[in-house]
Amino acid sequence: MSGGKGKAGSSEKASTSRSAKAGLTFPVGRVHRLLRKGNYAQRVGSGAPVYLTSVLEYLAAEILELAGNAARDNKKSRIIPRHLQLAIRNDEELNKLLGHVTIAQGGVLPNIHQSLLPAKKAKAGNASQEL
């Protein structure tokens, strides 16, 4: 008689996470839990955490790619807050999204006002053309 809870005859497959099903690296289950516990709404649909997780993963990848480029431009192999600051402030859309965000140890963008720069000298060739 085989009527028990034995493993014989059962074809259990390993459970796959919602992150793996969606092809994401960020945790869908954790985002779903945070949405439920955060009192954002009484109920949270099953697609909302997947969509939000994919958006968060995309933003993180975008910022890290630009920060990696900034680190490489400065001949560094490690991303520091300064590189994050440069990446965000030099990108128009990210700067608009994170305009009021302060990044600790980020510094400021290098900027010299035009009136403080030395005046350009006129070329000698221009005087002969006016005659």
UniProtKB/Swiss-Prot annotation:
A motif ([ST]-Q motif) lies at residues 128-129. The modification Phosphoserine is found at S128. The keyword DNA repair applies. Keywords: Acetylation, Chromosome, DNA damage, DNA repair, DNA-binding, Methylation, Nucleosome core, Nucleus, Phosphoprotein. It comes from the Eukaryota. SUPFAM superfamilies: Histone-fold. The modification N6-acetyllysine is found at K5, K7. Coiled coil: none annotated. One of its GO terms (biological process) is DNA repair. Phosphorylated to form H2AS128ph (gamma-H2A) in response to DNA double-strand breaks (DSBs) generated by exogenous genotoxic agents and by stalled replication forks. Phosphorylation is dependent on the DNA damage checkpoint kinases MEC1/ATR and TEL1/ATM, spreads on either side of a detected DSB site and may mark the surrounding chromatin for recruitment of proteins required for DNA damage signaling and repair. Gamma-H2A is removed from the DNA prior to the strand invasion-primer extension step of the repair process and subsequently dephosphorylated. It is found in: Nucleus; Chromosome. Belongs to the histone H2A family. Core component of nucleosome which plays a central role in DNA double strand break (DSB) repair. Nucleosomes wrap and compact DNA into chromatin, limiting DNA accessibility to the cellular machineries which require DNA as a template. Histones thereby play a central role in transcription regulation, DNA repair, DNA replication and chromosomal stability. DNA accessibility is regulated via a complex set of post-translational modifications of histones, also called histone code, and nucleosome remodeling. This is Histone H2A.2. The gene is HTA2.
